[in-house]
C-alpha cells in the first residue's frame, strides 16, 4: 500500500484494518484534492473556481437508514424511540465487509477536529474513497496546524464508502444504504450514499452523545456576536434560516449550524459552513453568494450551464443544493470559533400553516416547551422523499441527530438559560397570508429587521399582545416593519379559515407534547399553546 502526506506514523490505516487499499493520501491540501477529484472525474471545475460534485440518487440525508449500535453501555443512554438499533454482531460484520471493500482502492484521509473549545474537542479521522468528499469534510470541520498532524490521535473514525452496498439481511439494516454509529468505540460507517452531509451530521451525532455527560449543551444552531460582545444563538432545522440569518455584516459569525454551550460559553463544532444555495442571490445574501464563486468551495448538486457557470435558480436536480466552504470565506467570521454566554436565544420555525407571527417573546418555560416540541416544516430536498414543505415536530430542533432523550437536552438548556439570563424569542421564517400553497414566504427583510430589534434590545420597549392561540407575547408595532404581518390573522383573506388552521396547529402541539409531559414540570406543561381551549 502506497502512502502519501503528513500523518502520525503510529496510526496509519493498516493499523485499523484498511491495509488492503492500493494507496492512501493523508491530509491533502485544497489544490491537490482539486487535482485528484478532476482527474478521477468525480467533480467539475466551475467558471469561477469552485468544485461542483453530483451525488446521484441521494441528494439529501437518509435518516431511515441511520443506526446506533445497541450494547450494554448504550442500552440505557439512547432514546430508542428515535434511534434505530443495530446489534454489535451486525455492526462487526458491516465493519469487516467495508474493510474488505477497500481492496485495491485509492483512499483519502483528513485528520480534523470537532469542537473549537480545546476542553471538549473531538479529534476525528475521516476516510473517504472520493477526493471531493475529503475536500468537503476538510472545509466543514476544524483544521489542526500542519505541525500537529504528526502526533494526531483520533477519538472518532468515519469510513465513508459510497460504492459499498449494504446487505440488509447480513448487516441488519434497511436498504443498501447505511449509516451506522458505534458511539462507544468511536466508529461511524457510511455506505451506499454519496451525499456528503452524512459525514458532517455523523460528527454532530457523536458530539451530541458525548457532551451532555460533561455538562455541555450540544445544539443544532447558528451563532453570532455583536460588537459589544452580545452573543446570540439561532436554533432551527435545515432550511429555516440559521445560515442566512446568522450571516449578518454587523455581527461576527461564530458558526452556521452546530455549537456547544459549556462553562466557557458558546463554541462552534465546525470550521466551515454548509449553506443551501437554491435561489441564492447576490442582493439578498451577498456574503454567502460570494462563496459560490471561490476556489476551495464545494458546490453539491448545483446545475452548471454550458460555460460552467452555476445556475443557483435551477432546482432540477434537487431543491437541496449546497455550498460547503471554510468559515473564513465569510468576511466577519470568528477566528476562534468561540464567544461568551448568549444574551439572546432565537428559535426558528418555518410554519407551513401560516398562522404563527413573525416573532414572539418566550418565557423560560415556553422556551423549553418549544425547544422540546421543535415545530417547523420539513423543507423540500433536505431529506430524501420530501418534495414540498410539510409540518413536522423535530424535538430539540434536530431529532435525527439527538441520541439521548430530548428532556436531557431540554433540562440542560433550561439550567443554562436560568444561570445566564438569556432572553428567548420564537421567529417564524415560514409562511404568511395563508398556508403553504396559498400564502407567501415571510419577507426576509422583515425577519432581519425584527431580529435586529430583538438583538439590540429595542423590543424591550415595545408594546405586546398575548397571542390567543399560542399564549406568547407578540409585539404590536416595530419600526421599519409592516404592522400587518405582526398579526397573522389580519394577513389572511378569510379570518375564519385562519382560526380553523390555528386551532388545528394548537391541537398538533398538544398531541405531540403528550410524550414529554411525564418528563417536565408543571410550569413547562402549562406553557402549551391554547392549553385551556384544548382541554375544554
UniProtKB/Swiss-Prot annotation:
Protein origin, superkingdom: Bacteria
Cofactor: how and how many bound: Binds 1 Mn(2+) ion per subunit.
Residues that bind Mn(2+): 201, 220, 257
Where does it reside?
Answer: Cytoplasm
Family annotation (PROSITE patterns): PEPCK_ATP
Which Pfam family, any one, appears in the UniProt record? Answer: PEPCK_ATP
**Record EC number:** 4.1.1.49
Q: Which residues take part in binding substrate?
A: 61, 195, 201, 322
Intrachain disulfide bonds: none
Known pathway:
Carbohydrate biosynthesis; gluconeogenesis
Tell me its cofactors: Mn(2+)
Which GO molecular function, any one, fits this protein according to its record?
A: phosphoenolpyruvate carboxykinase (ATP) activity
CDD domains, alphabetized: PEPCK_ATP
- Please provide, in alphabetical order, the Gene Ontology terms of the cellular component aspect for this entry: cytosol
Q: Name one GO biological process term.
A: gluconeogenesis
Q: Which reaction does it catalyse?
A: oxaloacetate + ATP = phosphoenolpyruvate + ADP + CO2
| Residues at which ATP binds | 201, 220, 236-244, 285, 322, 447
Q: Which family does it belong to?
A: Belongs to the phosphoenolpyruvate carboxykinase (ATP) family.
Function as written in the Swiss-Prot or TrEMBL entry: Involved in the gluconeogenesis. Catalyzes the conversion of oxaloacetate (OAA) to phosphoenolpyruvate (PEP) through direct phosphoryl transfer between the nucleoside triphosphate and OAA.
Question: What protein name applies here?
Answer: Phosphoenolpyruvate carboxykinase (ATP)
Species whose genome carries this gene:
Rhizobium rhizogenes (strain K84 / ATCC BAA-868)
Organism lineage reads as: Bacteria, Pseudomonadati, Pseudomonadota, Alphaproteobacteria, Hyphomicrobiales
